[in-house]
Amino acid sequence: MLKNRVAVIYGAGGGIGSAVARAFALEGAKLFLTGRHRAPVEVVAKEIVSGGGSAEAAEVDALDEQAVDTHLQSVIDKAGRVDISFNAIGIPTPKIRVPLVELDVEQFSLPIATYTRSYFLTARLAARRMVANGSGVIITVTATLSRTGTPFVGGGGPAMAAVEALTRDLSAELAPHGIRVVGLRPQGMPETSRIKESFGAYAKASGVTWEQFQELLASRTHTRRLSTLAEMANVAVFMASDQASGMTGTVVNLSMGSLDD
């Protein structure tokens, strides 16, 4: 589905980014993997190459405009174009779980500023290259916090809602140039270390164990289970392919029914 497509993945060393990278590679994409720290990204790239795929690793801070721009230009120089931009960055989970009325403004603003800046920079700089080719796909990743009222998550909900709004606005501007912009909204996959850290802290603040909290989340889904990284990666492949050519300006609900559209 993605044979010879050139894909840039941000946060490729993390759970979501690495799963999507492997799925893209299986479908024939040429991968340029990035992360703030090179070592975990290099592990993923070597695994893909050893399996017969095409992948290069680079250390890129997705909050640094110059770093992102320089890397994208290097991709253009090597591959001639950028077909897919997939951003799966994460930020450390705040250790303090307090009500919004007690939350420090800097802690509240951190996820909002971080996620919106990264998604804006990576999308804008990729789009500038894609416009020249008249095609491309930009994929964002959010969470159900964008649509639910959830206590003790600080600026997480507003950050996710902002990224989804950015997804729609980018699509409105870029679709006439042949560029699709779509989002993926999982509820949270316990396979990832980031989710374990985030939900684990939330479980502790709620007075339950991590296992009990997972059971609670699963009980709220239609399937009575949480989604997996493989399921999300498969959807990412579809959304990045021409099979999803009719989809743009939308966010795919991967909440297993816990969030009704």
What feature does the model see in each segment?
Residues 175, 180, 247-249:
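Short, small/polar-rich loop/turn modules that mediate ligand/substrate recognition or access, typified
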Residues 91-92, 105, 111, 139-163, ...:
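Catalytic loop of short-chain dehydrogenase/reductase
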Residues 128, 172-173, 245:
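Alpha-helical segment proximal to the catalytic Tyr-Lys
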Residues 96-100, 104-109, 217:
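Substrate-binding pocket helix/loop in short-chain dehydrogenase/reductase
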Residues 13-14, 37:
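Conserved glycine-rich cofactor-binding loop
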Residues 29-43:
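Conserved glycine-rich Rossmann-like NAD(P)H-binding loop of the short-chain dehydrogenase/reductase
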Residues 97, 225, 237, 248-261:
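Short C-terminal tail/terminal secondary-structure segment
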